[in-house]
Amino acid sequence: MYLLRRALQAAEEAIKGSEANKYQLWNTEEYPTVWGTEASEANPGEILFEIVNTTTESPGNESMGYLTSPKGYQDMCITVSFYHHLLETPNDVRIKLLVNQDKKVMYLNKYQPQPGENIMDANIPIVRLSETYLNAAEAAVKNGDATKAAKYLKAIALRGNPDYTMPAKVTLDDVLEERRKEL
């Protein structure tokens, strides 16, 4: 129980510290288009930590952007079952991150290059504020704090799908389901 309380406390401290430094969750309108945009001091977005990847530092043909892009190797695609799962909630904004090449294979379009660069120069998001919210929701569920679990889950679920209906009581399965869609 001690570790669960500490996990929730750590997640909440990370959220408060991030938001105090102007990091914020992307809103529903921003979410599909913000990948690959440059953060600024005034608007750092929700990526808390990312690996900067340019062809100067690494061979671009092995970058996440190149591996996951239909314009690259096309090595990483989503499963058919995950695609059909996302289609069950057609108003979920995260569906807009999917790109298809030939209607047979779907790619996740999260590894975008910075403006003016090519797909080989896509940075790799490691930790996002949304993941921290989901960590807090999971720790709250495991700690029996239904109010905090609902608070953190709601922020991510409604951002992803404005038609989302919050369950009467948030369960671990609810949090894991949202994590599956978000990350």
Residue locations for each model-derived region?
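Helix N-cap / beta->alpha transition motif
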Residues: 69-83
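Acidic/polar-rich alpha-helix caps and helix-coil junctions
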Residues: 1-64, 74-77, 87-183
